[in-house]
Amino acid sequence: MFKLLSFANAPAIVRANQKDSYFESRLHNQLLDVVKAIKGSHFVHKYPEELRTLATALYLCLTTLVGSKTLGEEYVDLVYVSRDGRKIPKFASRFGFVVAYVLFPYAVRQLLQKLKAQQSRLAQLVSGVSYMNVMDLLNLHLALFYFTGKYYQFAKRLFGLRYAFGYRVDKNQQRARGNYELLGLLIIFQTVFKNVANLRKLWGATKTVQDSGDLIYRFRDQTSDVIDLADPKVLPYLPEASRTCMLCLSPMKDPSCGECGHVFCWKCVLDWVKERQECPLCRAKMRESQLLPLR
C-alpha cells in the first residue's frame, strides 16, 4: 500500500483505545458469566487473571489477528499500517503483536509472583526491582507516545504496527494533539521525582549503616588494649571450648557477639556482616549496629 493515508494522532488513538477497553470489558464480563455457569463461581474466583487474559486474547484474535478492525478502530476509523506507512502489516506482525501484548505481561506477572513467594532475600529484591523498572519503562513509553503519537502499546512498537486515518484529513486536524504533550511532561516529571525520592531513601538507609559502623570503629579505636583470648586470664568466664572463633579458627581477639549470642572475633564478624547480614552459625539477622564487644 502506498503512503496515501495520514498517520493518526494521539487523541484519535486514545479514543480508539478507550472504546476497545470498554468492549473488551463487556466481553470479559460475558465470558465470566459463561464460565461461571459451566465451572461454577469457585473456578472464576480461582483464575481471575487467566480469564481476563483469555478475554483479551479472544478480542484481539477475532479482530486484529484476522485482519479486521477492532470496535474502537471502527469508531475512530483507524487502520494499521507499517512503520513507513506504505504497507499493511503482515500476518506475522499481527500475530507477534497479539502474543506479546497478551501473553508477555501475564508471564511477567506470574514470574514476579513466584519470586515474591520465595522467601530468599535475592528473590524479593529481584521481584521488587523488576516491578519498579517495568512500570517506569511503561510510563516513559506512554510519555513518548504523548509526544509523538506513535505506538500506544510497547508491543506495537516492537512489531511496527502504526495507526493511520482511514480517510483524508486536513493538516490542522492532523497536527491537533490537545494537551497530550503536557501529559507526557507530567509523566516524565512524576517518574523522575519518584526515582529521586527512592534514591534518597536508599542513600539514607546506607548512610545509617555506615554511621553505625563508624561509631563502632571509633569505639574500638578508643580502646587501647586488644582483648586476646589466647591468654586464659582474659575473660576467664568464657569456657575453653567457646574461646575459639569459628570464622578464623583461632583464639578470639576482641570477642564480639550479636543478638543471637554467638561470639566471634571483632574483625572476623564485622567483615562477615558487611557481606551477609546474618549470623555465620544460626543465620539469625545480624547488623553492624547490633554487634556488642565483650568485656
UniProtKB/Swiss-Prot annotation:
The chain's Cytoplasmic topological domains, given as residue ranges, are: 40, 121-122, 200-295
- List, alphabetically, the Pfam families matched: Pex2_Pex12, zf-RING_2
Annotated TM spans: 10-39, 41-62, 109-120, 123-148, 180-199
Q: Which residues form a coiled coil?
A: none
Specify the superkingdom: Eukaryota
Q: Which pathway does the UniProt entry assign to this protein?
A: Protein modification; protein ubiquitination
Identify its membrane topology class. Multi-pass membrane protein
A cellular component annotation (GO) from this entry: peroxisomal membrane
Note how its activity is modulated: The E3 ubiquitin-protein ligase activity is stimulated by PEX12.
Provide the alphabetized UniProt keywords: Membrane, Metal-binding, Peroxisome, Peroxisome biogenesis, Protein transport, Transferase, Transmembrane, Transmembrane helix, Transport, Ubl conjugation pathway, Zinc, Zinc-finger
Q: Which residues lie on this side of the membrane: Peroxisomal matrix?
A: 1-9, 63-108, 149-179
Q: What is its main location?
A: membrane
Q: Which InterPro entries did the record assign?
A: PEX2/10 (IPR025654), Pex_N (IPR006845), Znf_RING (IPR001841), Znf_RING/FYVE/PHD (IPR013083), Znf_RING_CS (IPR017907)
Q: Indicate which residues the UniProt annotation says bind Zn(2+) 2.
A: C260, H262, C279, C282
PROSITE patterns in UniProt: ZF_RING_1, ZF_RING_2
Per the record, the GO terms for biological process are: protein import into peroxisome matrix, receptor recycling; protein ubiquitination
- Family statement drawn from the similarity comment of this UniProt entry: Belongs to the pex2/pex10/pex12 family.
PANTHER family, A to Z: PEROXISOME ASSEMBLY PROTEIN 10 (PTHR23350), PEROXISOME BIOGENESIS FACTOR 10 (PTHR23350:SF0)
**Biological role:** E3 ubiquitin-protein ligase component of a retrotranslocation channel required for peroxisome organization by mediating export of the PEX5 receptor from peroxisomes to the cytosol, thereby promoting PEX5 recycling. The retrotranslocation channel is composed of PEX2, PEX10 and PEX12; each subunit contributing transmembrane segments that coassemble into an open channel that specifically allows the passage of PEX5 through the peroxisomal membrane. PEX10 also regulates PEX5 recycling by acting as a E3 ubiquitin-protein ligase.
Q: Provide the domain comment.
A: The three subunits of the retrotranslocation channel (PEX2, PEX10 and PEX12) coassemble in the membrane into a channel with an open 10 Angstrom pore. The RING-type zinc-fingers that catalyze PEX5 receptor ubiquitination are positioned above the pore on the cytosolic side of the complex.
Complex formation = Component of the PEX2-PEX10-PEX12 retrotranslocation channel, composed of PEX2, PEX10 and PEX12.
Return the protein name.
Peroxisome biogenesis factor 10
From which source organism is this entry? Pichia angusta (Yeast)
Its ancestry begins with: Eukaryota, Fungi, Dikarya, Ascomycota, Saccharomycotina
